[in-house]
Structure formats: C-alpha cells, structure tokens
C-alpha cells in the first residue's frame, strides 16, 4: 500500500469519526478534507461512505448493553419492541428519499461551496432552536429515548432526511430536529446515536453494491484502515459528547459552522485555498 495513500485514508477516517456524531456534518468535512488532500474521485466517494461503518461500530460498542437488551427482548418485551420499531420508523424517510435522490445530490451538491452554504444555514438553525429553548418556557416533553412515541420517531426521521444535503449534518438534523419536536437534549442525542446504526450501515451497503464495479479486493486494506481510524476517533467523540451535553448546549457548534462556512466561501472566492470539486 502506498504510504501517502494510507496516510490520507487515516486522516479521512479520523475526520469521519470526530465529525459523524457532532452537529457539524461529517460528509461536509470529508468533502473539504478530500479536496485539500487531493483525495477525490468516484472511488473516494464510496470510501467516504464505507468508512462510516467504523463510526457506526463505535456506537454499537458504546451501547452494547442497551443493544443486547433490545435484541434479547424483541420477541417478549414490549419496551424492546417499541424501541426497535421507533428506530425503523425514523430510518425510513432518509432511506426512501436517498434511494430516489442520492445520485442527483452527489452530482450537484458534493462540492465545497454548496457544503459551505449548508454549514452556515445549519448554524443559524441551531442558534434559533437553542435560543427558543432558553428564552421560552420550553420544557422537554420526552426525557429519554424509551419515552418516545412512533410519531416522535417519524418526526426525527423526517428531520434526518434533510441531511441528504451535504453539509447539513445527519446528527445535527436528527438532534436539533428532535429538540424542536420536544425531546430533551440527552434523548435527542442518544436517539441520533442509535439511529446512526441502520442509517450508516444502509448507506454503506447501498453505495458499495451500487458502485461495486469501481472496487476490487486490493481496496480492502485501505478501506479497513480508514474504517479503523473512524472507529477509534468516533468512540472517543461519543464519550466526550455525552459528557459535554450534560452541561452545555450546541451553540458552540453553531458558531463553528457559521465561521467555517464563511471561511470556505471566502477562500473559494478569493482563491486563498484551491478547493477541488
């Protein structure tokens, strides 16, 4: 394996892991990082989706006890059945819309400038939701993921579907969408983690199968390296985020999105950075 190519795969994996579960858009950061590293092309787009499996496995490991309890109780326990059904319901909107529009979105919007615009718009939406929650008599209607109804799950799933637009953020859309519809910050964040499991796995399987002609057995080490880097960084990020939200809101991430998005737009306009499409 080419050492430079391996280093690029590791960097991309780290970027994926650290950004997948923060409301700042992993896809957007991967597009920008790939542009800077000159790591682009049709096969790289498959790589970017495939290494999400590493981030997904980090959630599986962190919540292995909860997941085992749900799987073990699927046939007998109402609580486990309800939780699993909520995940399926929330997964469907993005999955169905993705099947219809994913190719067009990749063709038109997987570029630095559209990503930067989505960063900025998403940042202002986060600020609006956080301000609403601070400045009103807002009280979370749903305190834990086990309190969610099927309608709550559907609403979060519809919010997550907006993340098909690169730069929006899957976790940001599902977390902020959940908070908008009455979930507590902790419930929205944890449900977003669980929702990532079928969402990321489904995206990986679909992308690898659809673009299988681009791939070969020789790609496995590179994909594995990126996936492992994503697993380690995502595991650290999930643990940190759970501590962070116990005492903080998401305002910092909103400002980060706005500032970083403006930087990308200005750097593209003035030629400070050469962003490859």
Swiss-Prot record:
It holds the Pfam family BacA. It is a multi-pass membrane protein. Keywords: Antibiotic resistance, Cell inner membrane, Cell membrane, Cell shape, Cell wall biogenesis/degradation, Hydrolase, Membrane, Peptidoglycan synthesis, Transmembrane, Transmembrane helix. The keyword Transmembrane helix applies. Disulfide bonds: none annotated. GO terms for cellular component: plasma membrane. GO terms for molecular function: undecaprenyl-diphosphatase activity. Catalyzes the dephosphorylation of undecaprenyl diphosphate (UPP). Confers resistance to bacitracin. This is Undecaprenyl-diphosphatase. It comes from Janthinobacterium sp. (strain Marseille). The gene is uppP.
